[in-house]
Amino acid sequence: MLIFTDPRFFVWLWEMEDEIHQCCPIVYWHVWDNDPYPDFNNVLYDSNDLINCLSYKTYGLVKPHFPDKTNYIPHALPTDIYYPLPKDAIERAKIQLLGEKRKDHFTGFWINRNARRKMPNDVLVSWKLFLDELQKKHGHRNATLVMHTDPLDQEGPNLLRTTEHLGISDSIFFSTDRLEFEKINVLHNIADFCLNMACNEGFGLGTLESMQCGKPIIALKTGGLTRQVVNCHDGSENGVALDPDCRDLVGSQNVPYIYEDHVANEK
């Protein structure tokens, strides 16, 4: 039996591991968001015959505690789903989506759920600071941030009100529909970069998708994002790697402790 991602989804299954093991082994494709090692998960890890970690951060946390059954199986994407489009196709798509007036805009892309952990309000504040600096240095605000998310998601802030408060509504484009892979690929291609400022992130699919489209990323060095934004072989950056400015230990009843990493908006 193959299970994957957040262990909280499968507590019910591990509770009947004895019955399952009479029929088949349990293989867990696992990701954990950040330090420290979650020893409260030990009883869950014990129940698996194999733990395959999709991020190197997760592998580094789990391997020392379960060395005989922990492997690193990095996340990957099919090259026929996310890939660079021809320049003329990108230009047409950008006009079709953003309009003629924004065809030459510097364009950023943020693709995440609107949830607190993803720090969407911090993204908007940072974008405002960037626009202000653009106006100051170059005399214009010709930049657009595309946010593929639900601005009214109950798990996050009201992003429509935030953009109004910051005075940047004209510089934000919300993509709210559920889209097939082909259209998500277009969104990645019309952008100049992809941004992820999540305070802890097990992996970060959006940034991997963007790099596969040939785009640089801006990412906080936290969780699985670190291995994406910093080349582990030569230390070069695949865009801009942001060092955390502070780290908070937070938690809940289900996850008693985990670190959140934060970066100053001014960066």
Task: Give the positions of each predicted feature.
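Nucleotide-activated donor-binding/catalytic signature segment of Leloir-type glycosyltransferases, i.e.
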Residues: 19, 156-182
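Glycosyltransferase donor-sugar binding loop
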Residues: 139-159, 177
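Conserved donor-binding/catalytic core segment of Leloir-type glycosyltransferases
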Residues: 99-118, 124-127, 145
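Carbohydrate-associated surface elements
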Residues: 57, 76
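Short alpha-helical donor nucleotide-sugar binding micro-motif in glycosyltransferases
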Residues: 45, 186-191
